[in-house]
Structure formats: structure tokens, C-alpha cells
Amino acid sequence: MTTLPGPWGAVLYDTTTTHVRTAPRRPAFRHRGCLWLVDLDHLPPVPRPLRPLAGFRPQDHALEPTGEGLTIRQELERYLAGHDVRLGDGRVLMLTQARSLGYVFNPLTVYWCRDGAGRPLCTVAEVHNTYGGRHRYLLPPDPEGQGETPKDFPVSPFFPVDGHYRMVLPEPGERLRLTVHLERDGGRAFTATVHGTARPAGPAALLRAALTHPFATWAVSLHIRYRGIRLWLSGLPVHPRPPVHPRPPDRPPGRPPGRADSAPSTPTPTPALTSTPTPTEEVPTP
């Protein structure tokens, strides 16, 4: 199995993200940014002076704080084991934004998982919303990277939690081309695309990315809120937020579940919260 190119064994993509709503109105926007493709067994060895510009922390991806010191890969393995998928010694590539200047917000992180023989095992799409919620969609292997899954996680207050996603997430190479469609009764309601061009990651590439896309991950979060406010001001109705459970910053309220090969314990229940989002404070990615 070949390694990723470059001095750090990782890839940086200069990306263009587009969002197009097809119902009930047709607003669209385009945003430029930068994404990393990394091997979870060989995260980029970013030198200490450059670490404020790029970091990959388990707590930025874990569905729940584990308090167990698991790596990103180990936490993903536990998730997969809960769905009867055994990763073994296979490779996992992760496409994501890096933590930069103390902050990260990832609307979509994608994991491409292969078994020990290098065969495609599954694809995992990890979605974050600005409520602080996180959710994963598990897709079976497909030669074209295509898959469908019901939508069961709140992302935008302008869409209810219904319909299904049609995802096209092929493992990238020199080019990155991802597409996500939201299909609802009556047809396609929303399409998001991410296109990018690869360059090997290293000190020079990281500095170039920092200069080309300063405050990139902050800009994503602010841009989402700005677009949400504009949609709200245009008269688009807002759907109440479904009940959510807050994520403690460092550890769960009770003892976390054990590893996949250990007997899980029962965590202390956390009261559910409900509220109606206001576009000025919490407007997730469309």
C-alpha cells in the first residue's frame, strides 16, 4: 500500500466548496479553503514552531469525550466495531480541516477505510453542526464512492430532519471531488460539492496555506452563520432544534463505554435540551 506523498506523508488540498439550495428557494454560495488528507497511523510531524497552524486532536473528532486517551484511529475503530466492521491493521485516510490558532470546525470529515489487504472496507462521513453535535454515517464500499443513507441528524435549522443523503465520496488522489445531495419528498433540496487540487504537505506548503487562507477554519464557521442570517432575513422558515445532549469539554458525565473488546458500563444520563435556534447565534451549515 503506497504512502501519501511529501515530506510529512500527507496532502493539502486547495478547495472550493459550493452550496446550492434547490427548494424552496435557490440561493447559492461558494467558499475557498484548505483541507488535509492524512494517514491516521502517520499523522503529519508538524514542527513545534508551526503547530499553532495545524493540529489533529482526538477530541476534535470523537463522537463523545472518552476520557481514555484514545487516538483518532482507536476511537474510530471502536465506532466501527459497534457496527460490526473490523478494521484490523488496515489503513485509514482522513480528509479534514486541521485545528489552527486554537480552533477548528469541521462541517464534514471523511474517512476512507481499507482492510489489511488494501481492499476498500467502508467510508465514514462525520458531520458536525454548530450546536456542538456530531454524527457519523457509515457507507459500504463502492467502486465510485457512492452511497445513500437516511438523514437522521440536524444540520440546518432551515431543513427538518427528514429525507436522505446521496453521497459521492471517492477516495481522492491528485484531484478531490466530493458531492452530497439531500433528497426530500418532491425532489432534490440541496447539493454541496467540494473540489480541490493536491499538493504534498510540508513546512513550505503549510506556511503557504496559512498565508493564502488565514483563519480558514474560523472563516468557515463565521461564513456559515452569515449565510444563515441572510437566509433567515429572506423569510425562510426556521425549524425548531430537536433535543440534543450537551458534550462536556473533557470527559463524559459518567464512566465512558469500554473499548470494543471490553464490557461497556452505563453512563450517567444527561438531561435533554430543547430550543429554537436564533440565526444570530447558532446557524449550522446548510
Each model region followed by its residue ranges:
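Mature, function-bearing regions of proteins
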Residues: 1-269, 273-286
